[in-house]
Amino acid sequence: MKTSTGTENRPENVVISQSVAILVDGNNLERAIHDEAGNPHSMLNFDTLIPKLLDNRSLNRLFYFREGRQISSKLKERLHHHYHGSVQPCHKSADIPLTIKAMQLANKVDTIIILSGDSDYVELVRHLKTEGVRVEIAAVTSATSSLLVDESDYFHEVTKDDWFTLPPRPPKRKPDRKQP
């Protein structure tokens, strides 16, 4: 597993000018975080993770792919406001839409970071690398394919420092019905 981006020993006056696209498989990452945290109310903290992933490189695009139509409007607004990102609802799995978007971006960016541990992306990683794109994976280690990690140029481990847990919502009370 590659655990160094190479920036640790870089002289201070050297600036790496890379354009980065981040593609998030929301369902895969959410499920991995919920399993690792043991809590369905745990959520990815983009404000800590995105700067860590970028490592002083420039963010070109951010896409969050998620199955289903029930996507938080707060998440949409936050990603758009802070990262000019967009949320892409998917009919079923995010695999195909994320792959298509990655192929469209391949000649527009230097690096693509895929936030998913799904082995379905192995062939995509291989293809992007043949196109000259640096491909990095960010995921929860326990839910990540070792083959995907081996094929990538770099692996970022998503840890408990990269998510937070919301308190559970209190149950909604039904109004008391007055009897005549």
Which residues make up each language-model segment?
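Domain-level signal for Mg2+-assisted phosphodiester chemistry and nucleotide/NA-binding surfaces
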Residues: 2-96, 104-107, 134
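Nuclease catalytic cores that cleave nucleic-acid phosphodiester bonds
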Residues: 68-180
